[in-house]
Amino acid sequence: MKPIYLEMNYFGPHENSVVDFRLLDESPIFLISGDTGAGKSTIFDAMTYALFGTTTGDRDAKEMRSQFATADDRTSVTFYFKQGNLLYRIERSPEQKLSKKRGSGSTLQKSTAKLAIVDRVKGIEKNNIAINPKNVGEEITRLLHLNAEQFKKIILLPQNDFSRFLKSSTPDKEAILKRIFGTYIFTSFSNEIKAKNSEMNAVYLEYDRKQQNLYESSIWNPIELKELEDAAEQEKLDLVTSLWKDRVARKNEIEGQTFEQEEKVISIEIAYKSALELENQFKNLNNLENDYQQNIIEKSAIFEENSEYLKKLKWAFPLKESIHELEQDIKQSKSVKNNIAGIISEKAKDEILLKKLTNEKEDLNKQQENINENKKVAEKIFIQIQLSLQVEKKQSKVEELKLEQADNLTLLESFKANLGQAAENISTLQDDVISDDYFINKREERNQLELTFRGKLIPTFQKVKHSKDDIVGLELKLKENTIALSENKDNLEKAKFAYNEKLKGRRRLMIAQLQSELQEGEACPVCGALEHPFTETIEESSYKELGNLLKEIDESQKKQTVLLEKNKQLQQLKTELKTSLDLKKIEADEFEKELSILYSEFIADYSQIFPDSFDEVSIDESLLNLTKSLELEEVKNDETKVKLADLESKKLELQEKVKDFEYSNQEFNRQIENLNAEITEIGITETSYNLIRKRNRLMEKADLFEKHLSELMAQLSDIKIKISSQTASLNSFESQEATLLERISANKEKIKEKFSEQEAFTTEFQILKEWAYDDDLIQISQKVEQYKADKARLKVEIKNIQQLIQNKKRPNLALIEEEKKQTNENYVFLQKKLVSAENEVEQAKSILSELKKVIKQQDKDASKKSAITKLYNAISGRASEDKLRLETYVVQNYLEKILDYANLHFINQLSNNRYRFELAGEGNNRRMDHGLDINIYDNETGAARSADTLSGGETFIAALSIALALSEVVQNTANGVQIEALFIDEGFGSLDQETLQKAMQALEQIGENRLVGVISHVEEMKATIGQRIIINKMGDGRSNIKSVIK
């Protein structure tokens, strides 16, 4: 991977910054320098974020959004890099709050990412690879064969993190080196063998589990479970076979007992059925005898009474119809007589009316000729009425046409006047219409103003604003610095005073300590006196107090040193702030002059529209008003065009209407002339009204005559029909009366004959009628017959049962039922026992079969498991004493090449032949994850030691050597990742002059075929490296980037 071009927008301190790595190809190494906090490491953060969505430090990607970014400013990073022969472009933006595209307020925009192959920087996209963060991350890992952490360990060495690869654990190193050197085939093979070993172990565990489950199955009773538990593993199969055979023997024994009990059940069932049948016969005999007593003997009197009454009913029943007919005929005969009398009376009245109507008809016949003559006159008048109506209709039409003609002439004059007005209006509007070229020119002028305003004035105004904001910020910082400097001076004076006081106390305590050590007769080491008069006043606590005071003096001295250093820094910062403030004021003045000149040119021709001095809001509003004014003028012009088109359309319509109305006037004259000629030709002068009145009078007389005649004829016809009907009805009633009298006489004779019979039960008509009409005849007859049948049946059934149970004793059914119940229960118990025994046999048989199957399969897989286990132990390091895995062994080979290259080209040179790398012999506590631990062999001590024991400068030298060697070895490896860039963030300040010079030589050596970038504040490196990227602070948290090529 080789960086080509990096663009940062509102990312950290970079508002719109670009790093073009193509400009840095002339020299093996380039330097990134700038003020502290200016954003040097942010360049590395941007590359890491673009590729992996993370930064080099602990900051989240969202926190990299510039603090000065507004809701309209979108944070994004665009990074171009080469991989092989292809140029890739990756664009990424973090989650951020941005202004809504529509309406007010903001919206949370999710993180985005896009990866594509392009033809050149800022060029055409050739292939779109991924368009979301997840897919982009997967594609980058596939392309580089590195994740973010591994990228930072071998390509990007962040600040204060050089020793991460050097001191990382074997698993971490192994993951990185496997990706770099493409040794995943060994990982895949190891994983496959591991999976097969795990699979085979799982299979064997399943075999053991299945066998154990079978031995501990719930089918075994506690005694059998105990036997299986105590038995040796190799004896358990034989024991299960023996237990199965025991169960078979128990089952056969229970089967024999069940068969014997089944025969007993059959025998007792036969005996029970016989006893039950005999008991039923005794019960039936008792029931039949009870029925005979209740239904035959006790009901015999009722039977005799019913028999006697039945004879009377049967005697009277044949006369039932005759009695009914006799009564109906007598009643009907009376009604017929009344009808005959009524018809005779009504017929006499109708005959008188018929004679009267006949005389009236003869009078009407004499008036008929006069009426017919009037009808003929009326017909002639009807023809005259039709002609008169035609004349009146034509006269009315003439009047209507004259009125319509008058209206038509009025409208014609009105349309002619409107036509003249329309022509006048059209002429006026044609003068008011503005050409389209006028508006095109006006819009171009307005757009040019907008372009000048947005493209020149606002950017210049923003420069003025930012400069003034920077001046305010610098003045505030200068003020804060002055306050802090004053406070620091006060603190320094206080610290000096306290320090001097503590020194006095120390002298006092040291004198006291010296006094305490003096011995009588020995000379004082200070004055040489042999007498020591004040030693008895020394306190024992002085020693402890002196120790504490010495600590306080040391702390006070450190504090004083810190304050002095801070005072120096504040003084330096004050000078820098004053210088920056002066420069900013000059810059602001220049920007204001530039803005003034540009604005004067801007309003030269538009002073009446825009304000005298630059005001962004007012200018924006003026431009908007100018746009609205132009739009309003254009709308009015469009409305005028529409009105003109409408008027021209109306003029054409009016011209057509004038023609139509002139033609209509001519047509009216022609129609009126035609109608007057037709009226003269008809020649009728009397009105239709008078003619209709004459005809109506004649027709009314004729209608009244015909109506009277018609009504008279109808009355004659009705009365004749009525008299005829009355004659027929009278004949019918007379015949009916004769028939009824004849039938009444016959029925009376029948009843009289019945009463005269010798066996007659009565001679009273009413009693006979009651018996004949009694509806209980059938019911009483059925009761009598049922009684006879029941009596005969019961006698036969009682006799039959008595014959069956003759000489037999009634059985004790309860005793037999109890015996039957006990026999059945014993049989059911034995059946259940047999089923249980059969189940136990089948279960034991199933267990035995399954055991044999599992053991057979286990024996079959034994050789396969042994081979896989041996292979797995070999590749996982379990078979060797060093416990080195196959994957680690392969990667260790590459690491040895890296260490050998580092020893030969870098570490010896940088450490003056003192150090060299070697692999650790074994891991701590013989752990499994070792094999890639790196030790440092010290030629001065003749012993190897851990990399953790190196100092800061030594650690940097060692880490740099490995990083450089790794880059070289990978470049020379066919399957390795192509590493065409190396970036180092700080660390050179810990090297002495000689080591620094050697490190520079090493960097230049590897920089011959790849890009090497260094961040450093070391002055020697600034002076030595010609190609530089300089990052300057601009105030307000902003920084800019400048490339320097020497």
Swiss-Prot record:
Pfam families: AAA_23, SbcC_Walker_B. The keyword Nuclease applies. It comes from the Bacteria. The keyword Transferase does not apply. InterPro entries: P-loop_NTPase (IPR027417), Rad50/SbcC_AAA (IPR038729). One of its GO terms (biological process) is double-strand break repair. GO terms for molecular function: ATP binding; ATP hydrolysis activity; endonuclease activity; exonuclease activity. Residues 223-239, 268-432, 468-505, 543-867 form a coiled coil. Keywords: ATP-binding, Coiled coil, DNA recombination, DNA replication, Endonuclease, Exonuclease, Hydrolase, Nuclease, Nucleotide-binding. ATP binds at G34, D35, T36, G37, A38, G39, K40, S41. SbcCD cleaves DNA hairpin structures. These structures can inhibit DNA replication and are intermediates in certain DNA recombination reactions. The complex acts as a 3'->5' double strand exonuclease that can open hairpins. It also has a 5' single-strand endonuclease activity. Belongs to the SMC family. SbcC subfamily. Heterodimer of SbcC and SbcD. This is Nuclease SbcCD subunit C. It comes from Lactococcus lactis subsp. lactis (strain IL1403) (Streptococcus lactis). The gene is sbcC.
